[in-house]
Amino acid sequence: MKTIVEIISFTFGLYSLILILLGTPANLLCFYVFKRLIPNRSNATIIVFSYLALVELLIPFTWNLNFATRELIYKRQRVITIKNLEQNSLFTCKFISYSAYFLLQCAAWLKTLATFARCVSLHHDWSIRKYFMKSTIIHRLSWLTIILFGLINLPILIINGKRITRIDPQTNQTRIEILCYQSKFFQFWE
């Protein structure tokens, strides 16, 4: 008989999978609507939201995919050696952790840029308005935000995760394990 904790964990794993399955087409639909409708192409806020839709399209694949895989697949196996997707390889450890930090920070700052663009569009007497409301400037600022936070989080991609060798005392076999978020320099990004 399953305990209440196992049932709740399974439910949350299923919920994470549903978020991925529903969030992906919803964000793609948002991107399509923001890019294809003619009145939206020159609106600064909508331009930033189109970039935000693409960034938020990838966010569930970092957090929810890891959780859903752990709760729905890895816990059902008899021999559990891997508990998270991040433990599969050093590349997945680095990629998932980098993506998680980069995408969330990038989404937050794109929302800030959209809020500022909306504020500028409402204040007609600001001198910055004539420059800031040009669609090419907004596209460049959006790309600059994405590139800037990609570079800011680059040390996570470089220094996070390490591969260690352990000897299993019961079987006397050597095992290679991936430890994510274990670097001594990682504390600066938390």
Model-derived regions, located:
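Loop architecture of class A 7-transmembrane GPCRs
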Residues: 1, 73-102, 130, 151-190
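Extracellular TM2-ECL1-early TM3 structural module of rhodopsin-like
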Residues: 5-17, 51, 55-113
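First transmembrane helix
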Residues: 8-38
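Hydrophobic alpha-helical transmembrane segments of polytopic
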Residues: 12, 16-19, 48-55, 138-145, ...
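Class A (rhodopsin-like) GPCR signature focused on the TM5-ICL3 interface and adjacent 7TM helical core
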Residues: 22-32, 110-124, 155-167
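Membrane-embedded alpha-helices of multi-pass membrane proteins, especially ion channels
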Residues: 27-34, 60-67, 149-157
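Membrane-interfacial loop-to-transmembrane alpha-helix junctions, especially the N-terminal start
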Residues: 43-47
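Class A GPCR helix-loop hinge within the 7TM core
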Residues: 102-141
